[in-house]
Structures are given as structure tokens and as C-alpha cells.
Amino acid sequence: MIERGKFRSLTLVNWNGFFARTFDLDELVTTLSGGNGAGKSTTMAAFVTALIPDLTLLHFRNTTEAGATSGSRDKGLHGKLRAGVCYSVLDVINSRHQRVVVGVRLQQVAGRDRKVDIKPFAIQGLPTSILPTQLLTETLNDRQARVVSLNELKDKLEAMEGVQFKQFNSITEYHSLMFDLGVVARRLRSASDRSKYYRLIEASLYGGISSTITRSLRDYLLPENSGVRKAFQDMEAALRENRMTLEAIRVTQSDRDLFKHLISEATNYVAADYMRHANERRIHLDKALEYRRDLFTSRSQLAAEQYKHVDMARELQEHNGAEGDLEADYQAASDHLNLVQTALRQQEKIERYEADLDELQIRLEEQNEVVAEAVDRQEENEARAEAAELEVDELKSQLADYQQALDVQQTRAIQYNQALQALERAKALCHLPDLTPESADEWLETFQAKEQEATEKMLSLEQKMSVAQTAHSQFEQAYQLVAAINGPLARNEAWDVARELLRDGVNQRHQAEQAQGLRSRLNELEQRLREQQDAERQLAEFCKRQGKRYDIDDLETLHQELEARIASLADSVSNAQEQRMALRQELEQLQSRTQTLMRRAPVWLAAQNSLNQLCEQSGEQFASGQEVTEYLQQLLEREREAIVERDEVGARKRAIDEEIERLSQPGGSEDPRLNALAERFGGVLLSEIYDDVSLDDAPYFSALYGPSRHAIVVPDLSRVAEQLEGLEDCPEDLYLIEGDPQSFDDSVFSVDELEKAVVVKIADRQWRYSRFPSLPLFGRAARENRIETLHAERESLSERFATLSFDVQKTQRLHQAFSRFIGSHLAVAFEDDPEEEIRKLNSRRGELERALSAHESDNQQNRVQYEQAKEGVSALNRLLPRLNLLADDTLADRVDEIQERLDEAQEAARFIQQYGNQLAKLEPIVSVLQSDPEQFEQLKEDYAYAQQTQRDARQQAFALAEVVQRRAHFSYSDSAEMLSGNSDLNEKLRQRLEQAESERSRARDAMRAHAAQLSQYNQVLASLKSSYDTKKELLNDLYKELQDIGVRADAGAEERARARRDELHMQLSNNRSRRNQLEKALTFCEAEMDNLTRKLRKLERDYCEMREQVVTAKAGWCAVMRLVKDNGVERRLHRRELAYLSADELRSMSDKALGALRLAVADNEHLRDVLRISEDPKRPERKIQFFVAVYQHLRERIRQDIIRTDDPVEAIEQMEIELSRLTEELTNREQKLAISSRSVANIIRKTIQREQNRIRMLNQGLQSVSFGQVNSVRLNVNVRETHSMLLDVLSEQHEQHQDLFNSNRLTFSEALAKLYQRLNPQIDMGQRTPQTIGEELLDYRNYLEMEVEVNRGSDGWLRAESGALSTGEAIGTGMSILVMVVQSWEDESRRLRGKDISPCRLLFLDEAARLDARSIATLFELCERLEMQLIIAAPENISPEKGTTYKLVRKVFNNHEHVHVVGLRGFAAPLPEALPGTADAS
């Protein structure tokens, strides 16, 4: 039998009235007896303070303050202490006979609040010979001692071997040690437990039925159902974990989204700007180099242009000088051509005028003859017209006469008269007065002969006149010709001069005939001379272009050298062309390849980034796609292995969960059917009876009962036999044991205990050997121990499962990443680095461009040399055929000689041309000049007289002819008298008149016509004479002008002059064209020089500015790179794929990210300020600072409990994995958390039943307690009706309320609270939440109503209330309740403490005077029976018969107050024996 631990003594050091006092405590009752103020309450206060050193609970008041909530300012402790160090120490001997000293060090704290400082401590292993006062005080002399400090105590104890001193910083640790060592009955884990314990002590101290205890009897007496409570706590904890998981998911999602958003946008914002500055820096460097190259190139071009300008200016000056000479020569040639053309036109005019003059002379002679003939005819016509007119007049007169007579006679008379008139006119004209009509015929013949004679004479004179006129005109003509050729001369000299002119003309004609040959010869020589001069000019120009003077003999050799050079240069140029084409083709191929690579580079870089991420994630290095696919296969295999291991761990975890759930069943029933059968049979499960068995005894009892440890203990087997028939819903083996469940023991078996085994003699012939199980599950302690082990294993498995799930998720994500990589990037990831190839190509391109530039320069030089050589060969080709000309020095002299001869010939030709016709005309008539015809005038006069004579003869002959014609009329002489009677004559006269008038009309018409013709002939003659004279004058003028011109007007002169002019014009045009070209080239060269100068200045300015920018940017870039490298973000920011974007695209990308970042960091003041500062484009390093700030902010946000990295980018990956794991864990947990309402009702009902049985067992211990009229005390436990109805609904009608329990929005507690409110709508829940109500409903204690009843006299069982009992009865009843609570605590804590520990039991009772002797005896009996210690305080007149009594007397000596203590053991003995150590030690 295990002995119960006991408190040995209480020691007070430096308390008010007690300097160093040790009270030895009795094993049962210790009585403190003394008057008022003797120190009884101080002693008990010291004991309580040592037990519960909690200043928040300690409140020592006297009985006058009973029920008060506030007392003195120091709550009764500060005033009980003296200044300095104070101690209250308990000396305990526990069940293991270990001495344990526990206590507190107290010290007053100065101040108005009167506070006290308390330090608990414990001493183990102290020898029994050492008293507590010896440790706590130090003797100074026989009369003095001092209190040691806590440190000195510690040093003193550490010096003792085997003694352990422990100082506690918390009350919980202090009480934990006291519980483990059996000093207190209950583990006081929390302030609530300490408060309950203190309230218990306080109720014991002050006595009576404490309302605090009775109102909370359920909390004091009913233990928390560890199984039910644990199940519901696990469920609620799981729900809380579920919510935490949900919150973790939400936070993880939020963090992931935030991390993703911030990292992506910040990376885009900063990396775009970073790469833009990097690109701009590279571009600026390239531009600076390009500007420098352009600067040097422009300088060389400017120098070349300046040299070229000087050469062209010199050549232009030469051409300007030559142009004046050429213009003068051209003007002279043009003037000469004009003169030649004028002379030719003059010569043509002369020839034309000469021809016209010859023609006019012929026409004039002809016209003179025509005019003469016309004059003769005119005279005849005039005579005929006059005769006709006369006849008409005569006839008219006759007719008039005849008309007057109106007869023939009249007419004849008229005719006769007219005949007479004609006769008279003939007589007058012919001077023939004797003329008669009859002699008229004779005279007519005579006069006609005379007329004929006159006509012949006139014709003869006319012939003579013509001959004379011809001779006269020939002489005049010859004379005029001689005068025209020789000039004015005497008529007598004409003959000699004419002969001289004719002889000179023959010579001149001979010379003129040679002019054509001379002109041809001269033209040929002049052409050769011009060719010679042109060749000399070309030679001079060639020498000038060649820059060297060459002899004529060296030109052929030079021609061969130039041809050889041309051939060489042509081959070089051809090869250069091919080489240039090859270089350009290679350059184009490089550029095309570069463009292709630049397009492929971002794809390759993205593939490399993905590959690097895969390498970082996998920790592997991949050199080919085959390795990637092989690693993917390894990943698949690893994933399958991890999934298999995870599933195995998950299955083991689920098995453990099931085992934990099975072990957590109340009563230890692993099969829920057993609970139903036990309830049905009215029995109790054997495991429930042994539920409180200790952990050490569990293997024994498990082996003792063997398979029957799941048996049902029933009061009577006979009653169960009837129910066994037809029983199906039961285990295969059902054990039933007959016995009393309240007093069941293991006496039903005969057992022999072996080493770790038992032999159970079931019958005489049947034994069962059972070994102790290695994992016993019999009893609540064993099950809880197993559950703890399973929980630990489950935690390990959960951690392993989480790790495996994480690894699986990571592997799956890695597999997905590899799959994405294979699908998107495998084709290009392992190709050669395009950027490296681009760098090589750029280097090669630079070499090609330099080679091409050098080649272009060389080719340009070769081309210039080739063109120069070609021009030289072309010039030599023109010069070589003219070498003979260049060597001919006499050509100019011969040209001058031929020119002189030609001039003479041309002079002769001009003479012949001018006077050739005159000489030709003069030559046949030159002989007429020998004599001058002087009789021409006399001949002219004779001819005129002959003409007049002929005209007179003609008139006479006509008149006679008219008379002859009218001769018949003379016979009408007799008719004149008969005018009125002769109508025939009138008619004849009329007819004759008409004939005469018609004749007259014809004569007039003929005369008029001939007169007009004559006038016309005269006009023509005058016109011809005038024209002849004019042309003669003009011809003379033309000859004079031709002489004035002084130019030979031969046939080839114009052609030569035009050829010369054209040649000079061509030379002038060529010169002007060249000059214009030079001027334009010079202007262009000057403009080019100006442009180059401006370009040079601009390039110098741009180069300086760009260099300054490069230098400035370099400083900023160095700061940026220093920040980047110091913070290790270069890998994040240097995104090479961005290098292929334009500045506008990067700026747009940065601006978009900036807008998103402004929204993202709007709630973060620090990041918002850093972002605003980073927007300065002139300070790129601030963007890096912002990026670093973002990373730092994200690192601080990383939850290190779930993410094992400091890198936010890696944190995103782990967040993704953790998110998947948490989601899966949430799903699994939700499946596990589905708890059955029926099982909840069964658990609660079973727990209530067990606790009711336990309370009944506690009541058995109080049946014999009596105080005054109280004969017995008991606890009554009932189930509340509202809660009983809830249990019934949960177990039987739960399907009607599945809307609550299946709701995802309600926890089980909340659903239970809602159901309770639905079943009891009349109950006001107040301000409590459904969760709080539900948690209360899950506690079985809230289902029970407990009240204390007393059996008092004749009243029977009454509710224990202070008003219905006397003070002593109330004190006794309250003490009974407290004893029951303590016993209940011990039972509850038995499984938590070692089986060899039985805790101390001690209660207090102040003011025991209220109890009578019988009641005190009852207390003594109760203490003895329950092995409980009791400390009571009683007045001096109370002296118990048993136990130990201390008499306390407070005395004052020399102003020092002390308590005198005398200890007595009982009053039954005749002579009381003083206890040791009771001397006054004040």
C-alpha cells in the first residue's frame, strides 16, 4: 500500500511576530490555539502563500470581511511581514519518502502601493538532520541571528553534496514540480487552475458552504473528459487549422500574386530602364566611335577636296585665259566667215546682176524693135482711124442730108457731097488741084508708087540706121567695157587699152584656172597644219596631264607602257570588282545572318533562361536535348517513387488516424457495437471499469484479461441470456462477465504472475499464458500514452507527408517546367550562342568593312590610275598617227607659199570673175574701137525725114483711095436735087454709115488697143532702161563693195571659213564646257568643302557632346553597376532579350510597369516614396535602389515558416508548391473532419454515465459524515432537460437537421449551437456567439446539474444552503464538499502522476469555535479515514483531544513584538509532553 505524502513542518522567517519559527505539522489535525491577534491567521497565511505564491489571488481577510471583494490595501500580506528578507517554507515527505522543501522568499517593496516581491524555490535531497531554520538564518552569537538572502541560501546549498536548489521564474513551473513530487493534488497548468485551487483553500480557510464552490461544482468535481474533449479539441483544432490553412492559402495566394506582380512589374520597370541605359550607353559608344571615324574621314575628305580645289582652280584659270584667246579667234573666224559669206553673196549678186544686165540689154534691144514696129502700126492705125472718122462724118452728113430729104436722092446727094469732100481732101493732100474722079485711079497708082518708094526708102534708111545704130552701140559698148575694166579713158585710147586688157585677161584666166588646185592644196596643207597644231596642243595637254615632258620619239614606248599598265590595271580592277563583289556578298551574307541571329537571339535567350532555371531547380547541368529528355525520364521515375512513398506515408498516417480515433473512444471500446450492447444489457465495458488503471499496470491487466479485455461486465448473466438469442450485430467473440461494476476486481481469475507474463487458470483443465504486450492499450492512461506515441508518429508522418507532398509538387512542377521547356525551347536551347556568333560576325563585319573601305580606296586609286592611263592611251592613240605631222617643220612655210600663190590666183580669179564677161564681150567687138561712127546723127535725121515722107505719101494714097472708092458717088450729082424723093439712097447711106461707123469703131479700137500696147511697150522699154541703168549702177556698187571687202570669194572659201569657225567653236565650246564643268565642280567642291567644314564642326561638336555624355553616363553607369553588383541583382536586371528591343519599346514597357507599380505600392509609404524618387530619368541608380527596396520588402514578407528561401523569385516557386500542398492538405482535412452527430451524442451520453457512476462512488464516502443535525451529505447529478432533448435529437433525429451539419459555412460547434437554438427557442442566448455556445455544448459538464444535499433531521434530504443550516453544520458540510473535490482531483490526476506517488491532502479551517466537539470529532474521523491533514484555528477555550495543538501568545518585550508558541500533542494524556523545537525563537 502506497503511503500518502505528508507536510512535515511550516517555517516562518521574519514574519510579524515570528523571526524564525517552525511548526511541525501533525499527520491528521494541527490546531492553532490562541487569542485574538495571537498569529493564527498569519501562520495560515504563510502556509497558503507557500502553496500558492500568486499575488493576483492572495487576499487574506478576517472573518469580518467574509464575502467582501476588497480588503486592506495590501490584501493582508504586506502587513504580516517585517522589513527585510522573509521566508515561508514547507517541509514535505512524499510517498517515495523523499524530503522536499518548497517555499517562497518574500520582501516588502518600498512605496505607497505596499507591494510584496515573491520568489518561489525548492530544495531536494536535503538531509533530515538539517532544519529549515538552520538554512534560512545565520547565528551571529548566542543572542543574535540574521536572515540569509536567497543568493546566500543558494550558495550554501550548492556547497552541500547531493542537495539541489531550484529557483522558479514562473508559478506554473513551481506548481508543476510540486505536482510531480506529490505536494499538490492537481496539476495547476494555468491561472484558472490556480484560481480554483485558491478558491478551494479559501473556502476551506474561512469555512462554510462557499457559493464560489457550489456554483462551480461541475468545474471542481467533473473532470474534463480527455477522450471527448480531446476528440472535440482535435476536431476544432483541425477546423482551426483548416481555417489557418485557408488563411495560409489566402495569404500565400496574396503573397504569390503580390510577389509575382511586384517582381514582374518592378523587373519590367527597372530592367527595361536598365537595358535601355545599357543599350543607349552602347549606342552612345558606337556613335562616339562613329563620330570619331566620320571626323577623321571628313578631315581627310576635306584635305582631298582642298587639294582638288587648288588643282581645279588652277585648271580653271588656264581655261579662262585660253577662253579669251579662243573667243577672239572664234570671233575673227566668225567675222571672216561672215565676210566670206558676204563676199560670196556679193559675188553672187554681181553674177546675177551681170546676167540680169545681159538679159536686160537683150530685152531692151528687142523692146526697141517692138516699140518701133508698134509706132509704125500706131501711125497706120491713126491714119486709118482718121479716114474712118472722116468717112463716118461724111456719111453722117450725107445721111443727115438724106434723112432730111428722106429719099435716095437725098442719100446720094449726101454721098455725092461726101465724094466731093473726099475729092477736095485728096486734092488738098495730094496737091492736085486738077484732080478729077476719073483721074483719081491714075493718081492713086502714082501716089501708091510714091508711097511704095517712100516706104522702101524709109526701110533702107531704117536698115542703115540699124546698122549705124549697131555700130554705134558696139563702139559704145566696147568703150564702156574698156572704161568699166580700166576706168575712165579717152575714146582714142580705147583700142590700145582694150588690146592690153585682153592680153592681161588671158594671163589672169590662166592664173584663175590654177586657183582651184592651189585652193585644194592649200586646204590640204591648212588641214595638216591644223592637225599639227591640234596634235601639238594635245601633246602639250598630254604632257601636262602626265606631269612630264615627253619627246615625240618616246611616245610609242610610252604608249606600250600605258597599254601594259591598262591591261594590268584592268585585271586589277576586274579582280577588284570580283573581290569587292565577294566582300559585299560576304558582308550581305553576314548582315543577313546577323539579322537572322538577332531575330533568333531573344528566343534563344528565353530558352537559356528557362534552361538555367531548370538547372537551378534541378541542380543538374545539361549539354544536349538528349540529357534533358533522359533527366525528364528520371524525373518521372522520381515522381512515381515519391508518389508511392507519399501514398505509403499517407496510408500509414490514415491508419494512425484511424487507430487514434479508435483509441479515443470513451471507455476504451474499439468496437462501437460493444457500447450499444453494454447499454442494451445494462452493463459496463470491462475497459471502462479499468479505464483509470495506471500506465505501469496496463500491461499486467491487458495480459490478465487477454481476449476478454473487451468483455462486458453485467450484474446478472441470467438476465442477459434471453437477449443473446438472435443477436447478430456483435463481434465474433463476445465476452460477458458477471459482477458489480461499482466494486469489480480481478478476483475472478486465479493468476500466477511470471516475468513479463501471466498464467491465468481459467479452469482446472484450461490455462492461458499471456505475455505482457509491448504496447498495452488497456486503460485510459495506456491508450493516451499510445495516442501520444501515435500523435508523435503522426506528427512525424505528417511532416514527412508534407515534405513528400512538397517534393512531389516540386517534382511535378519541375516536370511541367521540363515539359514546357521541351515543347517550347528544346529546339533552340542547345544551339550555339547567337550572341557569341553575332559578336564574331560583327567583328568579321568590321574587318570586312575595313577591308572593303581599304579596297574601295585602293580600287579608287587603281581606277583613277586606270582612267589616267586610259586617257593617256586615248591621247596617244590620237597623237601617234600624227607623229609625222609633229615632225614636219616645213609645213607652215609651204602653207604660206601656197597661200601667196592662192592669193594671186584668187586675185586673178576675182578679176576674171569681175571683168571676165566684159572681156568676153569686149573680145569680139574690140575691132569696132578702131574707128568712131560720127555720121549717126545725120542718118537719124534722114531716117526721120523718110518716115515723115512715108506717112505723107500714105495719107495721100489713102485720100486718093477714098476718092476712088467714092468715085461712083460722083455720078449722083443729079440726085442732090432729088433728096426728098430717093429713099434708096437714104438706105444705102445708112448702110454705108453703119459700115463706116463699124469701120471707124474697129479703127478706133485697133488704135486704142495699139496705143495701149504701144504705151505698154514704151513702159516696158522705160522700165527695162530704168532697170538696166539701176542694175548697172548696183553692179558698179557691188564691184566696189567687193573690192572694199577684200576677201577672196572662191568656191571653197566659205567651207574653209566655216570649218575654221566650227573648229574654233568646238574648241571654244569644249573649253567653255570644261570651264563650266570646272566652275560647277569648283562650286560643288566649294560647297562640298563648306559642307565638310560645317559637317566637321558639327561632328566635332557632336563628338565632344557624345564623349561628354559617354563620360557622364559612364559615371552614372558605374554607380548603377556598383549598386547592381553589391545587391546581386544583375542576373535579374540584365535581361539580354531586352537588348533587341528599341528604346521606345523599352520606354513604353517601363512606363506601363510604372503605372502598374504606382497602383501596387499605393498602400506602402516606403515603396511609394522610393518609387516616386526613382522616376527621375537623370538618376537611373534610383531605379536600382527601388528594385533593391522591393526585393528587401519582399524578403521581409516571406513567411519563413513555410518558405525556405530569401529570394522572392524562388519564394514564388515555393509558394506555388506550398499552395498546391496546402490545397491538398485542406481537401484531406475536410474529409477527415466530417464527424457524426450520433457519435457525438453517444460520446457525451457515455461520458455523462461514467461521471454519474463516479459521483455515486464519491457519495459512498460521504454517507457517514454528520455535523449537528446533518446525518449525511451527498451530491445529486441530473441531466438538464433541454440538453437531454438535444442528445436525443443528435442520436435519433439528426437527419432532419443535416442542413446545419452539412453546411460548409458552419463549424460543428456552430451547427450544434444552431440546433440547440432551434430546439429551445425560448432560451435567450444573450451576446454569446454560436461558436461559444457550441463549445459549451460539446462539454459534457454543461449537460449536468449538480447540487449538494444534506440529510438533516426530520427534514430528510434538503438542498445544502447556508440559510437552512447552522454555522457549524454549514462548515462541516462545506468541508465535506471540499474533501470530495480533493478526492475527485486526485482521481482525475492519478493517471498523470507516477503510480508510486500519493499526493498530500491538507485543508484549513479558521475559527473552528463554530464547531462543537462532535463535529470536530467527525472532522478528525474524516481526516483519519481519508488520510488528510487539517490545520484549524481555534480560540483558547478549544482544545481538541487528538492531533497537535499549538498555543500562540503574542507578547511585547522592549518594544519588540513576538509570538510565544507552545506545542502540545493531544489532551487525553495526564501529562502533556512538550514537542521538540517549540522553544521561543523570537
From Swiss-Prot:
Annotated GO MF terms: ATP binding; DNA binding
Keyword annotations: ATP-binding, Cell cycle, Cell division, Chromosome partition, Coiled coil, Cytoplasm, DNA condensation, DNA-binding, Nucleotide-binding
Localization, UniProt: Cytoplasm, Nucleoid
InterPro entries: MukB (IPR012090), MukB/SMC (IPR050308), MukB_hinge (IPR032520), MukB_hinge_sf (IPR042501), MukB_N_dom (IPR007406), P-loop_NTPase (IPR027417)
UniProt: ATP binding residues: G34, G35, N36, G37, A38, G39, K40, S41
Coiled-coil segments: 326-472, 507-602, 780-805, 832-1110, 1209-1265
SUPFAM superfamilies: P-loop containing nucleoside triphosphate hydrolases
GO biological process: cell division; chromosome condensation; chromosome segregation; DNA replication
Record has Cell division as a keyword: yes
Region Flexible hinge, annotated ranges: 666-783
GO cellular component, one term: nucleoid
Subunit structure: Homodimerization via its hinge domain. Binds to DNA via its C-terminal region. Interacts, and probably forms a ternary complex, with MukE and MukF via its C-terminal region. The complex formation is stimulated by calcium or magnesium. Interacts with tubulin-related protein FtsZ.
Similarity comment: Belongs to the SMC family. MukB subfamily.
NCBIfam families membership: PRK04863.1
General function of this protein: Plays a central role in chromosome condensation, segregation and cell cycle progression. Functions as a homodimer, which is essential for chromosome partition. Involved in negative DNA supercoiling in vivo, and by this means organize and compact chromosomes. May achieve or facilitate chromosome segregation by condensation DNA from both sides of a centrally located replisome during cell division.
Domain notes: The hinge domain, which separates the large intramolecular coiled coil regions, allows the homodimerization, forming a V-shaped homodimer.
HAMAP family cross-referenced by the UniProt entry: MukB (MF_01800)
Name the record gives this protein: Chromosome partition protein MukB
